């Protein structure tokens, strides 16, 4: 009887079964670092400095504003909205930021899973149905306002992560 493959498998078993979990503190630190990186990328885009994140712009009400208390699910939902907006913009300035938002959402999902509260999948948002019309009318304004508000939201998220937000 040939037991070669079985012996090799049994010999490798201790190595295969040893999986070290990533400490949640490391995930939280990586999340904060990525948020700071995204904020820096937004700062590097010079025209985003001209609008306050609190300023109201007619027709751009669908872009989320600041939220003082954020849960992990609210953070994920907010980032999903910004990601949809940024991927709709033709500007090359926002491609990397959009990719970073996807990575940030993945880190938030890890944080949520560590607290046993998996985040629901975010569907296409109804409030963004009119995005195409708004982009045709005011492409530049949409980019500036979206990036400015995203920056403010990310800074809120950074503060909230220090307080260990709930589900």
From Swiss-Prot:
Entry GO terms, CC: extracellular space
Coiled-coil positions: none
Disulfide bonds: 117-167
Similarity field: Belongs to the leptin family.
GO molecular function ontology, one term from the record: peptide hormone receptor binding
Principal place of residence: secreted
Pfam family, one: Leptin
Function of the protein: Key player in the regulation of energy balance and body weight control. Once released into the circulation, has central and peripheral effects by binding LEPR, found in many tissues, which results in the activation of several major signaling pathways. In the hypothalamus, acts as an appetite-regulating factor that induces a decrease in food intake and an increase in energy consumption by inducing anorexinogenic factors and suppressing orexigenic neuropeptides, also regulates bone mass and secretion of hypothalamo-pituitary-adrenal hormones.
Source organism: Bos taurus
Protein name: Leptin
Swiss-Prot/TrEMBL GO biological process terms: activation of protein kinase C activity; adult feeding behavior; bone growth; cellular response to leptin stimulus; energy reserve metabolic process; intestinal absorption; leptin-mediated signaling pathway; lipid metabolic process
UniProt-annotated location(s): Secreted
Gene: LEP
Keywords: Disulfide bond, Obesity, Secreted, Signal
Signal peptide residue numbers: 1-21
Protein origin, superkingdom: Eukaryota
């Amino acid at each position: 009887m040939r037991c070669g493959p079985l012996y090799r498998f049994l010999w490798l078993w201790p190595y295969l079964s040893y999986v070290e979990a990533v400490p949640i503190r490391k995930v939280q630190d990586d999340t904060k670092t990525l948020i700071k990186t995204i904020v820096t990328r937004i700062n590097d885009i010079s025209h985003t400095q001209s609008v306050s994140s609190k300023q109201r712009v007619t027709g751009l009400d669908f872009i989320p504003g600041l939220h003082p208390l954020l849960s992990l699910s609210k953070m994920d939902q907010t980032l999903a909205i910004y990601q949809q907006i940024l991927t709709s913009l033709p500007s090359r300035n926002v491609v990397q930021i959009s990719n970073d938002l996807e990575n940030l959402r993945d880190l938030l999902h890890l944080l949520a899973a560590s607290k046993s509260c998996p985040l629901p999948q975010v569907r296409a948002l109804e409030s963004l149905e009119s995005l195409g019309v708004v982009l045709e009318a005011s492409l530049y304004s949409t980019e500036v306002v979206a990036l400015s508000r995203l920056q403010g939201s990310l800074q809120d998220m950074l503060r909230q992560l220090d307080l260990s937000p709930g589900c």
